[in-house]
């Protein structure tokens, strides 16, 4: 959810998390950083736009990921859970075995192709029956009202969703799968990065590679050969 600050003439509250409450209300979780609010006073909510955009990138990427998984693995794939924040995304899905490196690469390539295709992301409210007729993917076991929100990404992905998304897939920048593992019988989990989080990951990896090469007294390009030679000497 969103983070940011809530301010008034008498205090400031730092919002670290937002949660859904019963009755359609939203709870703001955080700490008072200045003063104290007074009952009945007017407050101003200031959303951290950078956090919202990064979270939206990861959320939109999960939609592309689900469609790519169904294309590569089959229509038996269904969402079994997900988590997104500004730093990363996690997607749980139904599948009967570990994915091969080739399958993971195909999925990653498909997602990146749709990012580069700059697909418009369009949201529309319609009846549940209309959404089903449009082919929109829905969460298994989820209860929906008569009116639902449909998120469409070009002709590639159509899902029922009430979350925040980018306006165009090109804003996701890039997508990288970090891991794929089983979390329960018949349920797999993929963790991945997009946007600024992915850039930071590549920068950290590059630093580690250069550091390892320096320790081995070689260049990053020759590091594997150097390690193989060292292992051969040990035998």
Pin down the residues of each PLM region:
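A glycine- and charged-residue-rich anion-binding loop/surface
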Residues: 1-235
């Amino acid at each position: 959810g969103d983070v940011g600050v809530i301010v008034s003439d008498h205090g400031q509250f730092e919002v670290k998390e937002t949660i859904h409450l019963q009755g359609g209300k939203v709870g703001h979780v955080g700490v008072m950083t200045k003063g104290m609010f007074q009952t009945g006073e007017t407050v101003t909510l200031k959303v951290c736009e950078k956090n919202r955009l990064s979270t939206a990138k990861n959320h939109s990427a999960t939609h592309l990921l689900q469609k790519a998984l169904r294309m590569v693995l089959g229509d038996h794939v269904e969402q079994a859970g997900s988590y997104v924040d500004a730093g990363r995304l996690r997607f749980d899905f139904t599948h009967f075995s570990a994915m091969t490196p080739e399958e993971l690469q195909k999925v990653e390539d498909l997602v990146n192709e749709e990012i580069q295709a700059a697909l418009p992301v369009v949201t529309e409210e319609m009846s549940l029956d209309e959404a089903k007729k449009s082919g929109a993917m829905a969460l298994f076991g989820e209860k929906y009202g008569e009116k639902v929100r449909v998120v469409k990404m070009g002709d590639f992905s159509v899902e029922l969703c009430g979350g925040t998304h980018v306006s165009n897939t090109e804003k996701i920048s890039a997508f990288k799968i970090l891991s794929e593992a089983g979390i329960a019988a018949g349920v797999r989990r993929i963790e991945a990065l997009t946007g600024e989080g992915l850039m930071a990951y590549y920068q950290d990896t590059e630093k580690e590679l250069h550091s390892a090469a320096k320790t081995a007294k070689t260049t990053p390009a020759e590091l594997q050969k150097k390690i193989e030679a060292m292992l051969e000497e040990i035998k």
